[in-house]
């Protein structure tokens, strides 16, 4: 499991870094870049990678969340990522459903952290993050926040989702291996 976690972390860093490097800046949606790949093998490879990341890292998180009675949050996060990964195979072009699943995966992954952290600090982080993501995707804020995000809330959600899923999985693995 630790090997799978390290491979998932490396692939997430490489994928996000390659997306930012290829576009010379933050793309509107990192996972939406899969739609510029040729149909067939490249899209299947991306789908398999996202499935490996979600299934390989979220299963220990769900086990740990089950101890707190919040396993449905981890399961919903995993479902969002699995369906988001499969969409480029079945859809010919970028759709809003893909963005919605990406944002849902990002928010649900933060809810996993809030459940694992316990106490008020984890939930405070989640409720501070929610308006930021919604403002960056729906409202188009003005001022410095608008210039910074420029409607790139999907990118913010995806990066948070990758980092959080991998981070919470490492926390879950560390917690389970520390228990006798």
Predicted features and spans:
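Terminal transmembrane helical module of multi-pass membrane proteins
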Residues: 118-180
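Helix-coil boundary and interhelical linker segments in multi-pass alpha-helical membrane proteins
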Residues: 1-5, 58-72, 111-125, 174-180
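Membrane-proximal helix-loop-helix units in multi-pass membrane proteins
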Residues: 71-130
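Transmembrane alpha-helical segments that form the membrane-embedded catalytic/substrate-channel core
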Residues: 14-24, 82-89, 133-139
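Hydrophobic cores of alpha-helical transmembrane segments in multi-pass inner/ER membrane proteins
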Residues: 10-17, 48-58, 107-117, 132-134, ...
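Membrane-interface helix-boundary motifs at transmembrane edges
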Residues: 38-39, 62-70, 91-97, 119-121, ...
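Hydrophobic alpha-helical transmembrane segments of polytopic
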Residues: 4-12, 46-53, 70-80, 105, ...
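N-terminal topogenic module of multi-pass integral membrane proteins
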Residues: 1-62
